[in-house]
Amino acid sequence: MATISAKLVKELREKTGAGMMDCKKALTETDGDIDKAIDYLREKGIAKAAKKADRIAAEGLVHVETKGNDAVIVEINSETDFVARNEGFQELVKEIANQVLDTKAETVEALMETTLPNGKSVDERIKEAISTIGEKLSVRRFAIRTKTDNDAFGAYLHMGGRIGVLTVVEGSTDEEAARDVAMHIAAINPKYVSSEQVSEEEINHEREVLKQQALNEGKPENIVEKMVEGRLRKYLQEICAVDQDFVKNPDVTVEAFLKTKGGKLVDFVRYEVGEGMEKREENFADEVKGQMK
């Protein structure tokens, strides 16, 4: 049997919001497998599905830049929030975003080797900024999207660049509508554009969890199937952008809102600073010592 560490219990609590003893029991029952433990808690009705971005621990900025029919969303990390608010750092983020669009670099590694208009490489530019700002800075990721003249990009930054969203709306040039949908995605955090993007494997997994949940609630087997399909539809609505109630007008779905503009959401990218990353943990005493150096 796997040893269940306090750190593992803490991680499961943060992912599910379940109580400590429930988390410990779930991990014991599943030999310390955190994904199976999440399913166990859900089947028992103790926890909801864990969010995709469980821990936000790094600092930095997300920025969206558009040029004609090309757009990019980029995340650049810093060590502290103080630097993320620094004007020089903000200018660097915009400069890097424009460089991605100009060079169409495919990876972060390839981007670092590209040459800026001043003749220096992006790698050299970052090192210069580190020297000036006094913190480690790094380009974490970026995504380029393209459209036609008949489509629209939507760009939205929340909390000064803590969250950024880039949307692509087909069949409409209404940038305001595309931005409104980007704002919706920033707030609600869907995983997919539509249910067509959800894999059969994910649907079957969710169906099985919901079935066990219903059976554990003591529901008669003859109505479980109907219940599961109803809950599955609700689950898909929660993770698919076009089926969600539009935040600016909950009386219509995102799909219906865009239809009134003659458009259709075909793609989006949502970045939240540091999602999935963990910053080094320090205890309070070490933190104070570090500040006194």
Swiss-Prot record:
* Entry function: Associates with the EF-Tu.GDP complex and induces the exchange of GDP to GTP. It remains bound to the aminoacyl-tRNA.EF-Tu.GTP complex up to the GTP hydrolysis stage on the ribosome.
What Pfam families does the record tag this protein with? EF_TS (PF00889)
- Coiled-coil spans are none
Q: Give UniProt keywords alphabetically.
A: Cytoplasm, Elongation factor, Protein biosynthesis
User: Which cellular component appears as one GO term in the record?
Assistant: cytoplasm
Q: In the UniProt record, does the keyword Cytoplasm occur?
A: yes
Q: What is this protein called?
A: Elongation factor Ts
Outline the segment boundaries, as ranges, of region: Involved in Mg(2+) ion dislocation from EF-Tu.
Answer: 80-83
What organism is listed for this UniProt entry? Staphylococcus aureus (strain NCTC 8325 / PS 47)
Q: Does the keyword Protein biosynthesis apply?
A: yes
- Main subcellular localisation: cytoplasm
Source lineage: Bacteria, Bacillati, Bacillota, Bacilli, Bacillales
